[in-house]
């Protein structure tokens, strides 16, 4: 997916430590964005090295966002299967 967006809010870098399957300590880096395309507002997340190298973007300009939408299924506390759409940013210029 590719969209022209305006950044409403850029959240700070979040680093979450975890242990890999082989026992190696790792860090998962992510940065969230609240974006609008002029009609809709949506939350998108940048992860990994892209999030680490992410500068502070000018919120007054239009930016070109490339990303993907993934659907995650989960079961709530009542046993109902629910779905959540997640937007991941692969490139933001």
What does each model-identified segment do?
Residues 1-93:
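Single-stranded nucleic acid-binding surfaces, predominantly the OB-fold ssDNA-binding core
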